[in-house]
């Protein structure tokens, strides 16, 4: 009976170590994919030709409430 318990304990230890080994690369791959996606979105946001058409409408409305004219300049709203 004691031998069976020792064998079961060793089997459980081997299985748990294999699970830990498999989990680390998976988590690392998910983190890498998330950081790549974040960097792509950040790069797109830095390009004003993609963001200004969306922001310009909000900027014009914002500046119109201030009775000024608004322009989108590098993703910033400039009221003049």
Curated annotation (Swiss-Prot):
Q: Where is this site: Important for insecticidal activity, but not for antimicrobial activity?
A: 74-75
- UniProt site positions, description: Important for antimicrobial activity, but not for insecticidal activity: 36
Q: Quick one: effect of changing residue 36 to A?
A: Important decrease in antibacterial activity against E.coli. No change in insecticidal activity against crickets
Q: Where is this site: Important for both antimicrobial and insecticidal activities?
A: 42
The superkingdom listed in its UniProt entry is Eukaryota
* Keyword terms: Antibiotic, Antimicrobial, Disulfide bond, Neurotoxin, Secreted, Signal, Toxin
Question: Which cysteines link up through disulfide bonds?
Answer: 52-72, 59-77, 63-79
Q: Can you provide one Gene Ontology molecular function annotated for this UniProt record?
A: toxin activity
Q: Which GO terms describe its cellular component?
A: extracellular region
Q: Does the keyword Signal apply?
A: yes
Database matches in InterPro entries: Long_scorpion_toxin_alpha/beta (IPR029237)
Expression (tissue specificity) = Expressed by the venom gland.
Relay the domain remarks: Contains 2 domains: a N-terminal domain that is unstructured or forms an alpha-helix in presence of membranes and a CS-alpha/beta C-terminal domain, which consists of an alpha-helix disulfide-linked to antiparallel beta-sheets. The synthetic N-terminal domain (AA 22-51) induces paralysis in crickets within 15 minutes (EC(50)=11 nmol/g) and is not lethal even after 48 hours. It also shows significant antibacterial activity against E.coli but does not show any activity against S.aureus even at high doses.
Identification of the protein by name: Peptide LaIT2
Organism, by scientific name, is: Liocheles australasiae (Dwarf wood scorpion)
């Amino acid at each position: 009976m004691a031998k069976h318990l020792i064998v079961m304990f060793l089997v459980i230890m081997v299985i748990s170590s294999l699970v830990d080994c498999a989990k680390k690369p998976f988590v690392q791959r998910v983190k890498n994919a998330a950081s790549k996606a974040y960097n792509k979105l950040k790069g797109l946001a830095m390009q004003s030709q993609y963001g200004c058409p969306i922001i310009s409408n909000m900027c014009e409305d914002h500046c119109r409430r201030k009775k000024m004219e608004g322009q989108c300049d590098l993703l910033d709203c400039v009221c003049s």
